[in-house]
């Protein structure tokens, strides 16, 4: 089982709750966006994911769908992001056969080993700093552990997530990760589009 490699580096990775937010991120020029939608189900969820795919079509933005792999395949999304618990229930072979990229969350050395065993397109490591976005199973990882995870991942791209903002972004990038993911730094910003551009400038200058 092999998942496609990334077509281009993930760089700044915005995690947002709705298709409207996805559209805003595309217009702002975000390299990567993830729909993390917990509020919708059934046909409403399918329509929301289809709207996300339409918003990203023809743009530079790479669209990942959190958890909902069946709907992501149906909508023709760029990829799927799964948590550790989802690895037990998702049909990874179906995701690979559909040509979608796969990202996996990790919170420890053991989880990273498990994720790498299925050869994902990238792994996410976190939470790096304290975060209130979601309940985390482990304490914040910090930058020293993150450096070790980057080494352990080898050639697999690593996305750092959890409490990342423009104040600590450069220090996180210095660990060797290829991408920074942000939730609250975008969705709670007075000017989210300006935040996206400031993050992008860390790579694009």
From Swiss-Prot:
InterPro entries: Aldolase_TIM, ThiamineP_synth_sf, ThiamineP_synth_TenI, TMP_synthase. It is an enzyme of class 2 (transferase). Its cofactor is Mg(2+). This is Thiamine-phosphate synthase. It holds the Pfam family TMP-TENI. Its EC number is 2.5.1.3. Keywords: Magnesium, Metal-binding, Thiamine biosynthesis, Transferase. It comes from Neisseria meningitidis serogroup B (strain ATCC BAA-335 / MC58). HAMAP family: TMP_synthase (MF_00097). Disulfide bonds: none annotated. It catalyses: 2-[(2R,5Z)-2-carboxy-4-methylthiazol-5(2H)-ylidene]ethyl phosphate + 4-amino-2-methyl-5-(diphosphooxymethyl)pyrimidine + 2 H(+) = thiamine phosphate + CO2 + diphosphate; 2-(2-carboxy-4-methylthiazol-5-yl)ethyl phosphate + 4-amino-2-methyl-5-(diphosphooxymethyl)pyrimidine + 2 H(+) = thiamine phosphate + CO2 + diphosphate; 4-methyl-5-(2-phosphooxyethyl)-thiazole + 4-amino-2-methyl-5-(diphosphooxymethyl)pyrimidine + H(+) = thiamine phosphate + diphosphate. One of its GO terms (cellular component) is cytoplasm. Pathway: Cofactor biosynthesis; thiamine diphosphate biosynthesis; thiamine phosphate from 4-amino-2-methyl-5-diphosphomethylpyrimidine and 4-methyl-5-(2-phosphoethyl)-thiazole: step 1/1. GO terms for molecular function: magnesium ion binding; thiamine-phosphate diphosphorylase activity. 2-[(2R,5Z)-2-carboxy-4-methylthiazol-5(2H)-ylidene]ethyl phosphate binds at residues 131-133, 163. Condenses 4-methyl-5-(beta-hydroxyethyl)thiazole monophosphate (THZ-P) and 2-methyl-4-amino-5-hydroxymethyl pyrimidine pyrophosphate (HMP-PP) to form thiamine monophosphate (TMP). Mg(2+) binds at residues 67, 86. Binds 1 Mg(2+) ion per subunit. It comes from the Bacteria. GO terms for biological process: thiamine biosynthetic process; thiamine diphosphate biosynthetic process. 4-amino-2-methyl-5-(diphosphooxymethyl)pyrimidine binds at residues 34-38, 66, 105, 134. Belongs to the thiamine-phosphate synthase family.
């Amino acid at each position: 089982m092999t998942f496609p490699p990334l077509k281009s580096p993930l760089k700044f990775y915005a995690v947002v709750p709705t298709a409207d937010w996805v559209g805003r991120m595309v217009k702002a020029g975000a390299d990567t966006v993830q729909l993390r939608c917990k509020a919708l189900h059934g046909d409403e969820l399918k329509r929301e994911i289809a709207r996300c795919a339409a918003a990203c079509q023809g743009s530079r933005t790479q669209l990942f769908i959190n958890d909902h792999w069946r709907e992501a395949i149906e909508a023709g999304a760029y990829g799927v992001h799964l948590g550790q618990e989802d690895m037990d229930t998702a049909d990874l072979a179906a995701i690979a056969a559909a040509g979608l990229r796969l990202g996996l969350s990790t919170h420890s050395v053991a989880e990273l080993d498990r994720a790498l065993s299925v050869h994902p397109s990238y792994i996410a490591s976190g939470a790096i700093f304290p975060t209130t976005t979601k309940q985390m199973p482990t304490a914040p990882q910090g930058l020293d552990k993150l450096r070790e995870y980057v080494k352990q991942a080898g050639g697999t791209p690593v996305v750092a997530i959890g409490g990342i903002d423009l104040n600590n972004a450069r220090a996180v990038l210095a660990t060797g990760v290829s991408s920074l993911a942000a939730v609250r730094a975008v969705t709670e910003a007075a000017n989210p589009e300006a935040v996206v551009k400031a993050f992008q400038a860390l790579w694009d200058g």
